[in-house]
From Swiss-Prot:
<dbReference type="Pfam" id="PF08442">
    <property type="entry name" value="ATP-grasp_2"/>
</dbReference>
<keyword id="KW-0436">Ligase</keyword>
<feature type="binding site">
    <location>
        <begin position="53"/>
        <end position="55"/>
    </location>
    <ligand>
        <name>ATP</name>
    </ligand>
</feature>
<keyword id="KW-0816">Tricarboxylic acid cycle</keyword>
<dbReference type="GO" id="GO:0005829">
    <property type="term" value="C:cytosol"/>
</dbReference>
<keyword id="KW-0547">Nucleotide-binding</keyword>
<feature type="binding site">
    <location>
        <position position="199"/>
    </location>
    <ligand>
        <name>Mg(2+)</name>
    </ligand>
</feature>
<keyword id="KW-0479">Metal-binding</keyword>
<dbReference type="GO" id="GO:0005524">
    <property type="term" value="F:ATP binding"/>
</dbReference>
<feature type="binding site">
    <location>
        <position position="213"/>
    </location>
    <ligand>
        <name>Mg(2+)</name>
    </ligand>
</feature>
<protein>
    <recommendedName>
        <fullName>Succinate--CoA ligase [ADP-forming] subunit beta</fullName>
        <ecNumber>6.2.1.5</ecNumber>
    </recommendedName>
</protein>
<feature type="domain" description="ATP-grasp">
    <location>
        <begin position="9"/>
        <end position="244"/>
    </location>
</feature>
<dbReference type="Pfam" id="PF00549">
    <property type="entry name" value="Ligase_CoA"/>
</dbReference>
<keyword id="KW-0067">ATP-binding</keyword>
<dbReference type="GO" id="GO:0006104">
    <property type="term" value="P:succinyl-CoA metabolic process"/>
</dbReference>
<dbReference type="InterPro" id="IPR011761">
    <property type="entry name" value="ATP-grasp"/>
</dbReference>
<dbReference type="GO" id="GO:0042709">
    <property type="term" value="C:succinate-CoA ligase complex"/>
</dbReference>
Length: 388
């Protein structure tokens, strides 16, 4: 689950980290009031969406009057912001962050992720702040500094100081960086984060360090023990199909192809997508119906897949273990009838009662193509999607 910038900064402040004074508002009038509360004669207004690239898309602006802040809020609230990280429809803006202006002398980068290879939290720092860190890592990997956190003792101040020296910081900046480093590490662990970024972490004109941005992603599998963070969830930022799928415990991720995929098991689902791609097709989604491929779940899965207008054919790939394939076939037939599927459906059943399941499908009289193997299924669905 992603957090908005203002929510991330709220957590930063709770851990004593330096952030700008600001207010998240949802009306133009509140934007003007926020300027009064903050004081000064310059403010930064930022549209709040779960996507990067807001500045280039016009979603971040320096304003010098309350009227300009009010106008910016009126321009974006209720609208969609399109950036290079969103689709063509963009993300809806329901909050504007109004905060004090910061005089920037230099921009740095500081972030942390869970590194699966080392099974540790790894911090990354760079002098190349304010830009796409993936691009820096690809083009100039030597500019990415790393510090691995030992889970037994946690982040240590000396690790922060070492990074600070490598970044060229000096004097009080070293101590400030070490404090930010340790604070972020504690925040990461306490809240079960999967990713954390401060980009940029800036050196202000007076020499002090300041967290100018906040990007936080929480491990969805740990949300049950983060009740406070559940209240931070903004459903308007979710993909509508993915949100609907979650209600039925279906794991769905929208893609850009035209072949809908419905599979039981994440590994089999990924393998199915690979073999479809191998035979010249493009998957429209990842969808794992889980171990219990019941009629209700299959029906909802069909509804979700077919809500994508790009889908020209559907591949159902089910391995029957505890659940018998003939029962799964009955569920597929019932779902196809209920939903009124108009596109070709290719079904590959394997496992418990697979032959009986194929017979049930063949006798249904519906536009369902029974595949004899995974390769056959991929070839059949690619042909069907091409209208052959």
């Amino acid at each position: 689950m992603n957090l908005h910038e203002y929510q991330g900064k709220q957590l930063f402040a709770e851990y004593g980290l330096p952030v700008s004074k600001g207010f998240a508002v949802d009306t133009p009038e509140q934007a003007a009031e926020a300027c009064d509360k903050i004081g000064g004669n310059e403010w930064v207004v930022k549209a709040q969406v779960h996507a990067g690239g807001r500045g280039k898309a016009g979603g971040v602006k320096l304003v010098r009057s309350k009227e300009d802040a009010k106008a910016f809020a009126a321009q974006w609230l209720g609208k969609n912001l399109v950036t290079y990280q969103t689709d063509a429809n963009g993300q809806p803006v329901s909050k504007i962050l109004v905060e004090s202006c910061t005089d920037i002398a230099k921009e740095l980068y500081l972030g942390a992720v869970v590194d699966r290879s080392s099974r540790r939290i790894v911090f990354m720092a760079s002098t190349e702040g304010g830009v796409d860190i993936e691009k820096v890592a690809h083009e100039t990997p030597e500019k990415i500094l790393k510090a691995t956190i030992d889970p037994l003792v946690g982040a240590q101040p000396f690790q922060g100081r070492e990074l600070a020296f490598q970044l060229g910081l000096e004097g009080k900046q070293v101590q400030q960086f070490a404090k930010i480093f340790v604070g972020l590490a504690k925040l990461f662990k306490d809240h079960d984060l999967a990713l954390l970024e401060v980009n940029p972490l800036v050196i202000k004109a007076d020499g002090d360090l300041h967290c100018l941005d906040a990007k936080i992603n929480i491990d969805a599998n740990a949300m049950y023990r983060q009740p406070k963070l559940k209240t931070f969830h903004d459903p308007s930022q979710d993909d509508a199909r993915e949100a609907h799928a979650a209600k039925f415990e279906l794991n769905y991720v929208a893609l850009e192809g035209n072949i809908g995929c419905m599979v039981n098991g994440a590994g089999l689902a990924m393998g199915t997508m690979d073999i479809v791609n191998l035979h010249g097709g493009k998957p429209a989604n990842f969808l794992d119906v889980g171990g219990g491929a019941t009629k209700e779940r299959v029906t909802e899965a069909f509804k979700i897949i077919l809500s994508d207008s790009n889908v020209a054919a559907v591949l159902v790939n089910i391995f029957g273990g505890i659940v018998r394939c003939d029962m799964i076939a009955e569920g597929i037939i019932g779902a196809v009838k209920e939903v009124g599927v108009k596109v070709p459906v290719v079904v590959r059943l394997e496992g418990n009662n697979a032959e009986l399941g194929a017979k049930v499908l063949a006798e249904s009289g519906l536009n369902i193509i029974a595949a004899t193997s995974l390769t056959d299924a991929a070839q059949q669905v690619v042909k069907a999607a091409e209208g052959k």
